[in-house]
């Protein structure tokens, strides 16, 4: 409680309704152009959330656990949570999985924007808590941070919170989601001259692809959904990152990722989803590599949105009204069973799950 009172006082911005409307309109126009600037989304949520937050407050006020949360105002910040201790917990606990998610995607609970425009302490806390619990949602529903996974989580949050900004995100997300995505996965390391003019894009055993075709047969940008854990070549990474920044909003472009240090242990050579014609897995048993390709936008509309809606409806209690802090040292599967949380189905895991 004491920590949030200090945070509230230092972050409150006192402006009139006309100024709020101006900020809302400006942020909405800029969100589509620069979706990576999450503070814009936060400001728009602040200004548009009053009625939804009031309903959340009334729900929590009439719920025993909710009343405790409103009274104590716990926060997922270092003053309240010993994050390093969470990494020492058993691997299937909620706290360990939470830290694993944050470190995998280079995130931190402190990155979540504090509510700025509510004059009411409780309302400000509720919206701030909703943002902090967002990453817990990723963990318990097993969703990564791709555009389509974020959009699916927004469906769950819309069901649980009725926040207008979640509906806006759901409507815009398909336009921002790439039409096609693939991943080339290397066995040991990315070739040092990859993405340079002298790189041989035709098949070459030295580069350990699974794909026997020329990479030049694809028109693509290496953007949006990349994951590089071992960056031996800093020039490669900076070039990859620049591609990401330049093309983040190019929804019609084909996007891909390069991963290495991966070993495909599946026994199947080819898996093809005939009903949806969505994706295909090609594996080379000798080299143990994988080429994975699918259509994110189609997948979002046909599979992720329907699953997310049902997952949101079936969950017996909104995440923001659960005392998450008391569950961090508990088994994540027990948490899911307790609140009837349905994580991402297995067949969607490679496309949208935490890997």
From Swiss-Prot:
Its cofactor is Zn(2+). GO terms for cellular component: extrinsic component of mitochondrial inner membrane. Its EC number is 4.1.1.130. GO terms for biological process: ubiquinone biosynthetic process. Its main location: mitochondrion. InterPro entries: Coq4, Coq4_euk. The keyword RNA-binding does not apply. It is a peripheral membrane protein. The keyword NAD does not apply. It is found in: Mitochondrion inner membrane. It is an enzyme of class 4 (lyase). Pfam families: Coq4 (PF05019). Zn(2+) binds at residues 134-135, 138, 150. Keywords: Lyase, Membrane, Metal-binding, Mitochondrion, Mitochondrion inner membrane, Ubiquinone biosynthesis, Zinc. Pathway: Cofactor biosynthesis; ubiquinone biosynthesis. It comes from the Eukaryota. It catalyses: a 4-hydroxy-3-methoxy-5-(all-trans-polyprenyl)benzoate + H(+) = a 2-methoxy-6-(all-trans-polyprenyl)phenol + CO2. Belongs to the COQ4 family. Component of a multi-subunit COQ enzyme complex. This protein may be expected to contain an N-terminal transit peptide but none has been predicted. Lyase that catalyzes the C1-decarboxylation of 4-hydroxy-3-methoxy-5-(all-trans-polyprenyl)benzoic acid into 2-methoxy-6-(all-trans-polyprenyl)phenol during ubiquinone biosynthesis. This is Ubiquinone biosynthesis protein COQ4 homolog, mitochondrial. It comes from Plasmodium knowlesi (strain H).
């Amino acid at each position: 409680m004491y920590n949030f009172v200090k945070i509230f006082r230092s972050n409150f911005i006192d402006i009139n309704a006309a100024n709020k409307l101006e900020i809302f309109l400006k942020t909405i126009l800029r969100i589509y152009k620069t979706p990576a600037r999450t503070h814009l989304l936060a400001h728009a949520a602040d200004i548009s959330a009053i009625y939804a937050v009031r309903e959340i407050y009334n729900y929590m006020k009439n719920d025993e656990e909710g009343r405790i949360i409103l009274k104590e105002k716990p926060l997922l910040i270092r003053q309240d949570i010993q994050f390093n201790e969470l990494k020492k917990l058993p691997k299937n606990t909620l706290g360990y999985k939470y830290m694993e998610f944050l470190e995998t995607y280079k995130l931190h609970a402190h990155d979540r924007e504090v509510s700025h425009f509510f004059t009411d302490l409780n309302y400000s806390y509720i919206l701030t808590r909703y943002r902090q619990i967002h990453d817990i949602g990723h963990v318990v529903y097993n969703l990564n941070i791709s555009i389509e996974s974020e959009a699916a989580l927004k469906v769950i949050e819309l069901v649980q919170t009725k926040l207008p900004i979640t509906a806006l995100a759901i409507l815009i997300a398909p336009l921002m989601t790439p039409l096609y995505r693939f991943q080339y996965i290397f066995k040991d390391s990315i070739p040092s001259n990859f993405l340079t003019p002298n790189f041989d894009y035709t098949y070459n055993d030295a580069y350990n692809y699974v794909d026997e075709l020329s990479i030049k047969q694809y028109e693509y940008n290496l953007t949006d959904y990349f994951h590089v854990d071992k960056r031996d070549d800093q020039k490669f990474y900076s070039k990859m990152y620049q591609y990401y920044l330049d093309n983040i909003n190019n929804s019609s472009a084909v996007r891909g990722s390069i991963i290495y240090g991966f070993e495909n242990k599946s026994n199947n050579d080819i898996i093809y989803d005939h009903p949806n014609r969505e994706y295909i897995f090609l594996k080379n048993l000798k080299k143990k590599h994988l080429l994975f390709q699918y259509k994110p936008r189609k997948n979002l509309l046909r599979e992720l949105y329907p699953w997310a809606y049902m997952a949101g409806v079936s969950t017996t209690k909104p995440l923001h009204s659960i005392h998450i802090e008391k569950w961090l040292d508990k088994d994540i599967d027990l948490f899911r069973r307790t609140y009837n949380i349905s994580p991402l189905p297995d067949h969607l895991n490679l496309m949208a799950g935490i890997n």
